[in-house]
Regions:
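Nucleotide-activated sugar donor-binding and catalytic core shared by glycosyltransferases
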Residues: 1-156
Length: 156
């Protein structure tokens, strides 16, 4: 399991929490050579999220747990990851609705449900399908933003 904390300054607290569960951690910044006995790999560096979205079969967007509007799922969907999220997706309602209609995203209600869903094996065909749909959704979103900007420019 890979964890990419939104706030890198919290890494020490996250490590303490994980290790209190008798799980072994490794931090990306330390460039560990052997990951054989590692339970949780923590990406504690900036600018590398895309690299990990490319290799992950599913992504849990933790920003959707708290009541702040959620987290943008397009980046992960673009790379073919299945999107798992909490109940708070208000800032991205239309995107999540579309992802759900293609069975790419799933709302998680309990920690136990999350644990059961992230343990499935990666299915190459599913990943390719999700990647294609994610790219289509991203292109559509970019087109809508371009249209919005062009309409605003015409008004001035």
């Amino acid at each position: 399991t890979i964890i990419i904390p939104r706030h890198v300054h919290r890494v020490k607290d996250i490590i303490l929490e994980i290790e209190s569960l008798n799980l072994k951690t490794a931090c990306h910044s330390k460039k560990p050579k052997n990951l054989t006995n590692i339970d949780i790999y923590i990406v504690d560096t900036f600018g590398e999220t895309n690299k990990f979205h490319k290799i992950g079969s599913s992504v849990f967007l933790g920003g959707s747990i708290i009541k702040r509007g959620g987290q943008n799922p397009l980046e992960a969907a673009r790379y073919g990851a299945r999107i798992l999220h909490g109940p708070n997706t208000d800032n991205f309602k239309d995107i999540y609705k579309l992802l759900k209609s293609f069975k790419i995203s799933k709302k998680i209600n309990t920690p136990k449900e999350l644990a059961s869903l992230i343990s499935f094996k990666k299915n190459k065909n599913t990943g390719v399908k999700i990647k294609k749909i994610g790219k289509i959704i991203l292109k559509k979103t970019i087109k809508e933003i371009d249209n919005l900007i062009n309409n605003e420019v015409k008004k001035t």
